[in-house]
Amino acid sequence: MKSLGRHIIAEFYDCNKEILDNVEAIEKSMKEAAYETGATLVNSSFHRFLPYGVSGVVVISESHLTIHTWPEYGYAAVDLFTCGDDVDPWKAFSYLKKILKSQRVHVVEHLRGKYDEIGIPENSPHKMEV
């Protein structure tokens, strides 16, 4: 089924706690994850909370990647939303699983903007005239 985008919602468990609490490492990893997908990076913003935890977003031309960490639990919540046929969010997922040293994951993929539900013909390209 064709769609405008794919949204991967990932729960990373039993991660490296030091990495999860390092804002520089998380930002670098999220940017690298974006590049792994083949996306074009637009901007990013990351914040370290006190006493611990990091939240951040990488905005890409094709949508966004976000992360929220709870180092005290070894847990990270990650959203990987990409649009178009030229990027693969699963590459970002695999990269982050390795970098965060996650021992266990729960992940679902949700198709966003399904062609049949919007009324777009299956053979239409992603980019059309407005």
Curated annotation (Swiss-Prot):
Classification of source organism: Bacteria, Thermotogati, Thermotogota, Thermotogae, Thermotogales
What does the cofactor section's free text say about binding?
Answer: Binds 1 pyruvoyl group covalently per subunit.
Q: What is its EC number?
A: 4.1.1.50
Q: Looking at the keywords, is Cell membrane present? A: no
Query: Which terms in the Gene Ontology molecular function aspect does this entry carry?
Result: adenosylmethionine decarboxylase activity
Cofactor(s) recorded for this entry are: pyruvate
State the name under which the record lists this protein. Answer: S-adenosylmethionine decarboxylase proenzyme
Reaction catalyzed: S-adenosyl-L-methionine + H(+) = S-adenosyl 3-(methylsulfanyl)propylamine + CO2
Organism of provenance: Thermosipho melanesiensis (strain DSM 12029 / CIP 104789 / BI429)
Quaternary structure (record): Heterotetramer of two alpha and two beta chains arranged as a dimer of alpha/beta heterodimers.
**Which positions carry Pyruvic acid (Ser)?**
S63
Family affiliation: Belongs to the prokaryotic AdoMetDC family. Type 1 subfamily.
- How does it get modified after it is made? Is synthesized initially as an inactive proenzyme. Formation of the active enzyme involves a self-maturation process in which the active site pyruvoyl group is generated from an internal serine residue via an autocatalytic post-translational modification. Two non-identical subunits are generated from the proenzyme in this reaction, and the pyruvate is formed at the N-terminus of the alpha chain, which is derived from the carboxyl end of the proenzyme.
Site feature location: Cleavage (non-hydrolytic): E62, S63
What is its EC class? lyase
Extract the InterPro entries matched here: AdoMetDC_C, AdoMetDC_fam_prok, AdoMetDC_N, S-AdoMet_deCO2ase_core, S-AdoMet_deCOase_pro-enz
Q: Name one GO biological process term.
A: spermidine biosynthetic process
The record's NCBIfam families line, in alphabetical order, gives: SAM_DCase_Bsu (TIGR03330)
Q: In which pathway does it act?
A: Amine and polyamine biosynthesis; S-adenosylmethioninamine biosynthesis; S-adenosylmethioninamine from S-adenosyl-L-methionine: step 1/1
